[in-house]
């Protein structure tokens, strides 16, 4: 008796108690943390319990606390925690490089990345931007917008995505913003079109060389490319094979730098102009056109237009012209699809061709995302571009590698972790099985015992702060949880051989001895370990009666008799407790 009192007065008992178990006891009182088997007790001796200052009050407090936990034990699952607040993501910054004539913020109004993250639109021209790019810090853009000589916007930000709607280079206007494109690419910013393709489109002969590759791949019948000659400088420009020819100087847009040469004398004059410009030049045969053709592609949307000059100018984009939309043929689709594959892919592009009076087509140019929009569907095309940008932004990985989503409770994860065999609980006679945790742990019917301790989601499902099992708990003899009284009772009442048998059900388990029985009952079970002090049996007997509520619903006679016997043993435990 003195030995038990010394063991029960150990001050480390409260440290072994799980959080929340018997919360009404403010001083060291009754609870057990018995080892799973005699072999486990020899390897890991643990203090059994603390001294009992008031056994009667502690017993009834434990009874009331356990009765409150009984519905959770029978259900087999903890009540899921309340919904937590979702993570608020910062808005994504979209930099649109375009002139002030188009307000792109209205086309992105109400749109969200992945339906969750807001989009903040910053719009400016290349001339209003400056930046600093870093290897690990990304790209910091400084924007200073000036309207009518007055600075209206001046701020710095780190964009997440870029929509390029302006030419980055033009020799005719003296605008060279290729350094900004390099800086944006240096910062690793995604864009539509890609910054790699934007930089490659800063040289029209370079782009035309890609058309030559497509021409050799598809052939002149499927891809009719105009005949063109390239001169890196003025020195090789002696004569043209035939006249009239169209001479294009350097890199320019909107018809600038294009001259029609009728004869050899005019060609020599143009050669001197090329020498003064110190640039390259191209010549191509003049085509007496009936109308121009433009096939554009925005994402997966295709449109074809026909433009006819009314003023009689050989440049259809100069003077008066009539524009109309025509049917999209497979021939046109092949042209634009083939051109959209250059430079790693063009999300937005257009192909310009000329239809001659003899009925033949000639492809003369391809444009990227900076192409001007024409026709009656300009608003629709801008909306298509906005939808394309939002789709591209949604495909990008989120910062940190995780998508923003609210935290979810653990209960659905536990249900999904169960195997189909675990959902069907049925009595199998002749096969013993240790009982599952009664305090909200998932019921395991046909899975082996090591699998119960090896599931991480099942280890953390123990309520009231129960600690997860140790990594060495793969063997059934080492499965011991201080917060689960029923596991303590099952491990102390069954032999090691019985605890190591997997795949058993609850109904066929032999009833473990109650430590408050008489001497004759203990003699009948001499093969089992010696019972602890009778004061320790009140919680174990209590869990015996509560754990049977999970199996009593099946209504077998043996279980009813076992329940009645447990109640009788509980009464004897009360009598033994108060007699001391």
Curated annotation (Swiss-Prot):
It is found in: Cytoplasmic vesicle, Secretory vesicle, Synaptic vesicle membrane. The modification Phosphoserine is found at residues 9, 455, 462, 470, 475, 481, 484, 541. Residues 91-399 are annotated as: C. Residues 400-531 are annotated as: J. One of its GO terms (cellular component) is extrinsic component of synaptic vesicle membrane. The keyword Repressor does not apply. Residues 1-28 are annotated as: A. Residues 19-56, 395-567 are annotated as: Disordered. It is a peripheral membrane protein. Changing residue 470 to N: In patients affected by schizophrenia. GO terms for biological process: neurotransmitter secretion; regulation of synaptic transmission, GABAergic; synapse organization; synaptic vesicle clustering. The keyword Nucleotide-binding applies. Neuron specific. Detected predominantly in brain. Residues 28-90 are annotated as: B. Belongs to the synapsin family. The A region binds phospholipids with a preference for negatively charged species. May be involved in the regulation of neurotransmitter release and synaptogenesis. Interacts with CAPON. This is Synapsin-3. The gene is SYN3.
């Amino acid at each position: 008796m003195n030995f038990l009192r010394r063991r029960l007065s150990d001050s480390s008992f409260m440290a072994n108690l799980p959080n929340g178990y018997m919360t009404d006891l403010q001083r060291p009182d009754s609870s057990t943390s018995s080892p799973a088997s005699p072999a486990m007790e020899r390897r890991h001796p643990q203090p059994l319990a603390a001294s009992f200052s008031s056994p009667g009050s502690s017993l009834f407090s434990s009874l009331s606390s356990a009765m409150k936990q009984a519905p959770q034990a029978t259900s087999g699952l903890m009540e899921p925690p309340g919904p937590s607040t979702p993570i608020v993501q910062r808005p994504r910054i979209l930099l649109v490089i375009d002139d002030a004539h188009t307000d792109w913020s209205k086309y992105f109004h109400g749109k969200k990345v992945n339906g969750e993250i807001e989009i903040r639109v910053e719009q400016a021209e290349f001339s209003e931007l400056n930046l600093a790019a870093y290897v690990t810090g990304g790209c910091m853009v400084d924007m200073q917008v000036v309207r009518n000589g007055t600075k209206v916007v001046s701020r710095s930000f780190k964009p997440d995505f870029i929509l390029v709607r302006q030419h980055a280079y033009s020799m005719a206007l003296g605008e060279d913003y290729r350094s900004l494109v390099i800086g944006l690419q240096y910062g690793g910013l995604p864009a539509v079109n890609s910054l790699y393709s934007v930089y490659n489109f800063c040289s029209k002969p370079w782009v035309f060389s890609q058309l030559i590759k497509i021409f050799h791949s598809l052939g002149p019948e499927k891809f009719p490319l105009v005949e063109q000659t390239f001169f890196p400088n003025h020195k090789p420009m002696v004569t043209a094979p035939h006249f009239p020819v169209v001479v294009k100087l350097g890199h320019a847009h909107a018809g600038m730098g294009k001259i029609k040469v009728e004869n050899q004398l005019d060609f020599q004059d143009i050669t001197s102009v090329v020498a003064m410009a110190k640039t390259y030049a191209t010549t191509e045969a003049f085509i007496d056109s009936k109308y121009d053709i433009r096939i554009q592609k925005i994402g997966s949307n295709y449109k074809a237009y026909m433009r006819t000059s009314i003023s009689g100018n050989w440049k259809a984009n100069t003077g008066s012209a009539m524009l109309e939309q025509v049917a999209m043929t497979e021939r046109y689709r092949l042209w634009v699809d083939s051109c959209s594959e250059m430079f790693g892919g063009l999300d937005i592009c257009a192909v310009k061709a000329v239809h001659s009076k003899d009925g033949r087509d000639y492809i003369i140019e391809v444009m990227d995302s900076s192409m001007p929009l024409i026709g009656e569907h300009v608003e629709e095309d801008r909306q298509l571009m906005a939808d394309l940008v939002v789709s591209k932004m949604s495909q990008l990985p989120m910062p940190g590698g995780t998508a923003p989503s609210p935290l979810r409770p653990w209960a659905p994860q536990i249900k999904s972790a169960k195997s189909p065999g675990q959902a069907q609980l049925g009595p199998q006679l002749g096969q013993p099985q240790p009982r599952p945790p009664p305090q909200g742990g998932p019921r395991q019917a046909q899975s082996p015992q090591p699998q119960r301790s090896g599931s991480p989601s099942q280890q953390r499902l123990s309520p009231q702060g129960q600690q997860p099992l140790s990594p060495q708990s793969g063997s059934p003899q080492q499965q011991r949880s201080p917060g689960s009284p029923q596991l303590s009772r099952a491990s102390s009442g069954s032999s090691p051989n019985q605890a190591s048998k997997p795949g058993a059900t609850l109904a066929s388990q032999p009833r473990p001895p109650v430590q408050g029985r008489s001497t004759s009952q203990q003699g009948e079970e001499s093969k089992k370990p010696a019972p602890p002090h009778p004061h320790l049996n009140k919680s174990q007997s209590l869990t015996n009666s509560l754990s049977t509520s999970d199996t009593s619903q099946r209504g077998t006679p043996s279980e009813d008799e076992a329940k009645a016997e447990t109640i009788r043993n509980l009464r004897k435990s009360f009598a033994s407790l108060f007699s001391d």
